[in-house]
Amino acid sequence: MTVQTAQIVKNYIGGEWVESISTKMEAVYNPATGEVIAQVPLSTKVDVEQAVLAANEAFKSWSKTAVPKRARILFKYQQLLVDNWEDLAKLITIENGKSYNEAYGEVLRGIECVEFAAGAPTLMMGKQLPDIATGIESGMYRYPIGVIGGITPFNFPMMVPCWMFPLAIACGNTFVLKPSERTPLLAAKLVELAEEAGLPKGVLNIVNGAHDVVNGLLEHKLVKAISFVGSQPVAEYVYKKGTENLKRVQALAGAKNHSIVLSDANLELATKQIISAAFGSAGERCMAASVVTVQEEIADQLVGRLVEEANKIVIGNGLDEDVFLGPVIRDNHKERTIGYIDSGVEQGATLVRDGREDTAVKGAGYFVGPTIFDHVTQEMKIWQDEIFAPVLSIVRVKSLDEAIEIANESRFANGACIYTDSGASVRQFRETIESGMLGVNVGVPAPMAFFPFSGWKDSFYGDLHANGTDGVEFYTRKKMLTSRWEK
């Protein structure tokens, strides 16, 4: 698959590829080379209006389309994604920067989300009680809610859209997607394949852009719900603005995930899992391992192992076969990350592996090498903030109690992991850690699509999480019918 140089990305509204009303453009870069690969429009509220009206019109017929027919379209869509996985993975690598192997993994996760959505009609069935009183029966029915707005991030340009719009449209809704302006090409490919699968015009729409598009969706009266994934400040804004406009909102936000390594842990396993979780996708994921709390008696061993493995990581263009660590998304994010590394040094942490010194960092792309700090404390910015980069902080503790106490001080609570062979320690961890997704001897405890993606604290704003039965609840509303039938 060839990406056209500096191609102009279009919006997709009412089944047609159309140019934005706006003449303002933003460059889309290949972060591994710094080359401009496309221009994306910064669309206006007028573009949003057109897309919402098209989606609202399509809702009239799509919401009445038989549930099995909706499912058949999604099953065909799933097969098209399978047939095109190589092109999809390559496109993710080109515009996001992650390694081809990681991009392939993301494609698989996206396909899993579509598979779940295709089977979601079985979760849409209502409930009925035939005899709530003599001759009276009562039942609950599920219905779609209308036009949904989806706002997705750059770091998972396939998986996140695929956990949003397939489930929403499976439930009978129509959808307006605002992909990240940094990764619009993959979103366009997803829509092309949905069209090929037979999705009717107007059911799925794309409006590219930034703030104006977000606000247009949040303010439009015909948009009934908003699903968002992104940074904490924007998630909080989306939740407040959306709910002020009487919309149903789920806003998945930032993270600072803690991994606890106890003295009885398998250090070889823990090292392998932490390296992958901390430095995979250049640390640009909300389930990345960013803090490790380790018991003092094994801390030197673990730190030594982590540095040794980090030194083996191949950094470079994700299309190269041996590369594990690709670039961060933009030059300003690279500079921000280097600023955090500088801050860690200034605040007294021990820099045991300096990602600023890797050869690739000096080149044209936006590279930061794997960085590891030891002797980190809670007062440091590198402990407190979501860096969203390949930077790992090590905190030394005396006990599991102390490790859990430290983890619970974080305002973020997406995921947490523990490495141990003790069932009692796992139980204590499960019952006392304040985090929504937990792992035992695994580095990234992200659940499959049939379970909710359930962050806590400042990692999530809303009541119903993405995916699983929560997702079906989010995209549907209930209607109760009570009937009296007498002879």
Curated annotation (Swiss-Prot):
Which one of the record's GO molecular function terms can you name? methylmalonate-semialdehyde dehydrogenase (acylating, NAD) activity
- UniProtKB keywords: NAD, Oxidoreductase, Plasmid
At which positions is NAD(+) bound? F154, K178, E181, R182, S231, E386
Q: Which reaction does it catalyse?
A: 3-oxopropanoate + NAD(+) + CoA + H2O = hydrogencarbonate + acetyl-CoA + NADH + H(+); 2-methyl-3-oxopropanoate + NAD(+) + CoA + H2O = propanoyl-CoA + hydrogencarbonate + NADH + H(+)
Q: Which InterPro entries match?
A: Ald_DH/histidinol_DH, Ald_DH_C, Ald_DH_CS_CYS, Ald_DH_N, Aldehyde_DH_dom, MeMal-semiAld_DH, MSDH_GmP_bac
Report the EC code(s) recorded for this entry: 1.2.1.27
Pathway where it operates = Polyol metabolism; myo-inositol degradation into acetyl-CoA; acetyl-CoA from myo-inositol: step 7/7
Q: Name one GO biological process term.
A: thymine catabolic process
| Enzymatic class | oxidoreductase
Could you tell me which cysteines form disulfide bridges? none
Q: Which residues form the signal peptide?
A: none
Q: Does the keyword Manganese apply?
A: no
Task: Name the active site residues.
Answer: C286
Instruction: Explain the purpose of this protein.
Output: Catalyzes the oxidation of malonate semialdehyde (MSA) and methylmalonate semialdehyde (MMSA) into acetyl-CoA and propanoyl-CoA, respectively. Is involved in a myo-inositol catabolic pathway. Bicarbonate, and not CO2, is the end-product of the enzymatic reaction.
Family, according to the entry, reads as follows: Belongs to the aldehyde dehydrogenase family. IolA subfamily.
What subunit structure does UniProt give? Homotetramer.
**What's the protein here called?**
Malonate-semialdehyde dehydrogenase 3
Species name for this entry? Bacillus cereus (strain ZK / E33L)
Q: Which gene encodes it?
A: iolA3
